[in-house]
Amino acid sequence: MKGPRSDNLAVSRAVGANVAALRRTRGISQRTLASTTEQTGKSVGFSTICRMEKAAAPGAAPVAVYVDDVVSLAAALGVTVQQLITTPNCNACMDSPPPGFACRTCGATA
């Protein structure tokens, strides 16, 4: 039995947007992030990361994200799964400034 289908895929879009923002905040490329996921035990490919990030853009076709990929990306980025699947309170630091820094926008510290 199939459940209702959502063409919006809001959580998958949030993951793509959050991965892109966290990656940029940390100054790492998509290829570097893909390589880092190999150390988590579940590799997420460069092309998968590209598709996730592109799908987060307004008007872009949605792309479903696998739970295992979300877990691996969260570990590689040093955040929780919850931080990847929800929209952050602060878009400047994604509610997770780098260690030793404070966000100038919201004041959050690591």
Listing of model-derived features with the role each one plays in the protein:
Residues 1-35:
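A short, Lys/Arg-rich alpha-helix, primarily the initiator
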Residues 2, 9, 82-110:
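Short, charged recognition helix plus adjacent turn
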Residues 11-13, 60-66, 81, 85:
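Hydrophobic alpha-helical segments that drive targeting, anchoring, or assembly
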Residues 18, 29, 66-69, 80:
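Residues that mark the N-terminal boundary/hinge immediately upstream of a DNA-recognition element
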Residues 27-58:
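Short alpha-helical DNA-recognition segment
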Residues 37, 53, 69, 77, ...:
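DNA major-groove recognition helix of helix-turn-helix
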Residues 43-47, 56-75:
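Short, basic-rich loop-to-helix N-cap that marks the start of a DNA-contacting helix
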